[in-house]
């Protein structure tokens, strides 16, 4: 674990110290590069550091974190995770992504309110300082439309139907 950095340390360091640290960091990053005739490329993770794959089934989608909130939105909630897993299953066909997609859809559906026959909605509390203010947003990025679009994307992935991409996965179509 890194030692605590105190303000006194910054007073003792010079501009040359920071420059040397920047150069050392750049040289270290360069050791991770794969040299090709066209230049250098970097793997997403260095060899042997793909342990994140073991963490995904432990924490997503049932447990939440600072980046994955207990909310129904595309940016940081269950709808966005479902959109990701459905797209990855659609593009790769891997059973791992299929399992994540189904688990996430189950969690999203269990978080919904369907007491009115034929209707389903999701509620959120966005005001951390007013936890009693709970609302159902209709929006695509934050709200019911986004939840429904992720479920629709899941359906399309399961049935092989093509949908217009609503989010950032449009660049995969080039490959």
Functional labels for PLM-detected ranges:
Residues 1-175:
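Glycan-recognition and catalytic cores of secretory/periplasmic carbohydrate-active enzymes
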């Amino acid at each position: 674990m890194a030692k605590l950095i105190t303000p006194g340390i910054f007073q003792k360091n010079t501009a040359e110290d920071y420059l040397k640290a920047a150069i050392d960091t750049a040289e270290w990053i360069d050791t991770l590069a794969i040299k090709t005739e066209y230049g250098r490329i970097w793997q997403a993770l260095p060899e042997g550091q793909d342990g994140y794959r073991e963490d995904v089934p432990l924490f997503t989608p049932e447990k939440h974190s600072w980046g994955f909130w207990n909310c129904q939105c595309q940016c940081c909630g269950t709808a966005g995770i479902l959109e990701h897993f459905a797209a990855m299953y659609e593009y790769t066909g891997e059973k791992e992504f299929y399992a994540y997609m189904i688990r996430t859809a189950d969690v999203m559906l269990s978080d919904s309110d369907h007491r009115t026959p034929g209707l389903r909605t999701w509620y959120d509390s966005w005001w951390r300082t007013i936890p009693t203010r709970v609302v159902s947003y209709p929006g695509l990025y934050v709200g019911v439309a986004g939840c429904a679009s992720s479920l629709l994307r899941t359906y399309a992935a399961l049935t092989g139907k093509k949908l217009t991409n609503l989010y950032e996965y449009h660049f995969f179509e080039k490959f």
